[in-house]
Amino acid sequence: MELTTRTLSAQKHIALVAHDHCKDMLMKWVARHQALLAQHVLYATGTTGNLVSRATGLEVNAMLSGPMGGDQQVGALISEGKIDVLIFFWDPLNAVPHDPDVKALLRLATVWNIPVATNVSTADFIIQSPHFNQPLDILIPDYPRYLAERLK
């Protein structure tokens, strides 16, 4: 597949997602980085977004709850180039009914080459990166070219 460049702006669009057993961990992480996160545009699945907003006062664009389609909504935003970073604290020790949605979300984040954090350590690496508050060019699939090839 051919690639093209997408520029992530200095103000990132960040999706926050957390499974039930990980919500408290994400809430503590957001609270520690609240001042920095306030400079960016936040999205989240429904329950997580409402909890973050209520606890911190941060403006969060909340989707539906994950099991009700929120993971897929976030995935669609990633595919549309509207999400720059995914912070997804998932629980590897407990299965969730919407596991296929979780796998699809992680697959789309990989396809569209956005940074993904799946735990506190990787989230800290991302937020402390010198690229976090700067524009950054990433390589993504060249979808128009892909479609043109498929339609030959």
From Swiss-Prot:
Cross-referenced PANTHER family: METHYLGLYOXAL SYNTHASE
E.C. number: 4.2.3.3
Protein's job: Catalyzes the formation of methylglyoxal from dihydroxyacetone phosphate.
GO term, biological process aspect, one: methylglyoxal biosynthetic process
Catalytic residue list: 71
Binding-site list for substrate: 19, 23, 45-48, 65-66, 98
Entry's family note: Belongs to the methylglyoxal synthase family.
Superkingdom as given in the UniProt entry: Bacteria
SUPFAM superfamilies: Methylglyoxal synthase-like
Gene Ontology terms: cellular component: cytosol
Keyword field: Lyase
Enzyme class, UniProt record, top EC level: lyase
UniProt domain MGS-like: residue ranges: 1-152
Reaction catalyzed: dihydroxyacetone phosphate = methylglyoxal + phosphate
Protein name per the record: Methylglyoxal synthase
